[in-house]
């Protein structure tokens, strides 16, 4: 059988590394051939975190980081190919998400901005790059996010089965597959790992709360949880999307200003409950029972999964592994899929999810030649 090799590149709002996946789309289901994670060097990570907040000299910093992130993404590709022992000539295209530094679709003239220069990636890998997937959807009046529901629909939908696919990265998003293959809903529920990561990084200088152990050692403060859940985003109707612009360290510090007496682990437990409660509320609005499959980094947080299961007793909870897709690499596979859709001239957004006026072919092509 002929191969249809594409590479997907993803770095999410967690900024915990560049995930690179090699996927074969020749069969009915995507086949994951090889994976690689390229760590983000600390100086680059600090620069990206600064760029995500308003500041001075932003254009110079943006230009430099755009190229630097492009070089890092190219390094991820070259290391992936070396690991897989596959030649660049065998790859049809790379689908690069880039690194989001602003996502503000609800302004009068909404926009989203991802960096990681695709020209640099194409030049340094010798492979054509499909990138800038979100802005076409925004140009059509959409949110530009989430984009993974179209991939979830094609890969996970089954006639007669009500399924929720929950992707927990920095931000959490859900795809509701109604059991009718044509009908799908999806949106960002709010914070996924972004606040629990930020708090443990600030207090303990650890990158993330492994297995949710620190959160499990604390007790949730119901007053703080109620205050956090009163954020207007949680009561917005979908289509909706969000990011670090709303849920960031500055917002968290503002929320904690009246709760100085709380133990640090109690704050961590409360932040984990914010993630779980906001997700569960939105899922229950869609359907009282069904199947729930989790992917993204949150799928590996034992405490998170247990709390979610307790809030959704009538859902069968599992990871996307049960459906044949490794939860760690699901989003990278989705961007390889988006590159394939572009290459075939096929639409990849879902207007019911993003609010765009129509379906569209997403992304632009950046030639290696």
Swiss-Prot record:
The metabolic or biological pathway listed in the UniProt record of this protein is:
Amino-sugar metabolism; 1,6-anhydro-N-acetylmuramate degradation; Cell wall biogenesis; peptidoglycan recycling
Q: Its Gene Ontology molecular function terms?
A: ATP binding; kinase activity; phosphotransferase activity, alcohol group as acceptor
Gene3D superfamilies registered for this protein in UniProt: 3.30.420.40
- Record keywords, A-Z: ATP-binding, Carbohydrate metabolism, Kinase, Nucleotide-binding, Transferase
Q: Answer whether the UniProt record assigns the keyword Transmembrane helix to this protein.
A: no
Give EC number(s), comma-separated.
Answer: 2.7.1.170
Read off the InterPro entries from this record: Anhydro_N_Ac-Mur_kinase, ATPase_NBD
Under SUPFAM superfamilies, the record lists: Actin-like ATPase domain
Q: Can the keyword Secreted be found in this entry's annotation?
A: no
Q: What class of enzyme is it?
A: transferase
Query: Pfam families of this UniProt entry?
Result: AnmK
| GO biological process terms held by the UniProt record | 1,6-anhydro-N-acetyl-beta-muramic acid catabolic process; amino sugar metabolic process; peptidoglycan turnover
What is the reaction catalyzed? 1,6-anhydro-N-acetyl-beta-muramate + ATP + H2O = N-acetyl-D-muramate 6-phosphate + ADP + H(+)
Positions annotated to bind ATP: 12-19
Tell me, what does this protein do in biology?
Answer: Catalyzes the specific phosphorylation of 1,6-anhydro-N-acetylmuramic acid (anhMurNAc) with the simultaneous cleavage of the 1,6-anhydro ring, generating MurNAc-6-P. Is required for the utilization of anhMurNAc either imported from the medium or derived from its own cell wall murein, and thus plays a role in cell wall recycling.
Q: Which HAMAP family does this chain map to?
A: AnhMurNAc_kinase
Q: Which family does it belong to?
A: Belongs to the anhydro-N-acetylmuramic acid kinase family.
Q: Under which name does UniProt file this protein? A: Anhydro-N-acetylmuramic acid kinase
Biological source species:
Shewanella sp. (strain MR-7)
């Amino acid at each position: 059988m002929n191969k249809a090799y594409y590479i997907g590149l993803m770095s999410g709002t967690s900024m915990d590394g560049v995930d690179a996946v090699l996927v074969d789309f020749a069969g009915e289901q995507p086949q994951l051939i090889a994976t690689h994670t390229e760590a983000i060097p600390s100086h680059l990570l600090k620069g990206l975190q600064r760029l995500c907040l308003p500041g001075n000299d932003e254009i110079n910093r943006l230009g430099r980081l755009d190229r630097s992130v492009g070089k890092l993404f190219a390094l991820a590709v070259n290391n992936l190919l070396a690991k897989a022992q596959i030649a660049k000539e065998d790859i049809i295209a790379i689908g690069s998400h880039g690194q989001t530094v602003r996502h503000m679709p609800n302004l009068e003239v909404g926009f989203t901005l991802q960096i990681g220069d695709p020209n640099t990636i194409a030049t340094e890998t010798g492979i054509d790059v499909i990138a800038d997937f979100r802005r076409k959807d925004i140009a059509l009046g959409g949110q530009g996010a989430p984009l993974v529901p179209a991939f979830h629909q094609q890969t996970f939908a089954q006639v007669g089965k009500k399924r929720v696919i929950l992707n927990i990265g920095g931000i959490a998003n859900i795809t509701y597959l109604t059991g009718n293959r044509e009908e799908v809903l999806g949106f960002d529920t709010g914070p996924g790992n972004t606040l629990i990561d930020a708090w443990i990084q600030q207090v303990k200088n650890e990158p993330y709360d492994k297995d949710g152990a620190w959160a499990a050692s604390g007790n949730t403060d119901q007053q703080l949880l109620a205050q956090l859940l009163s954020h207007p985003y949680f009561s917005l109707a979908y289509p909706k999307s969000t990011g670090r612009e709303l849920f960031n360290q500055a917002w968290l510090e503002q929320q904690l200003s009246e709760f100085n007496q709380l133990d640090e682990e109690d704050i961590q437990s409360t932040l984990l409950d914010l993630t779980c409660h906001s997700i569960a509320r939105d899922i229950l609005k869609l359907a009282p029972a069904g199947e729930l499959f989790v992917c993204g980094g949150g799928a590996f947080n034992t405490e998170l999964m247990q709390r979610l299961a307790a809030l959704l007793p009538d859902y069968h909870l599992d990871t996307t592994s049960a459906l044949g897709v490794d939860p760690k690499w699901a989003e990278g596979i989705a961007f390889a899929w988006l590159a394939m859709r572009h290459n075939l001239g096929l639409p990849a957004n879902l207007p019911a999810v993003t609010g765009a006026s129509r379906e569209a072919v997403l992304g632009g092509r950046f030639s290696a030649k």
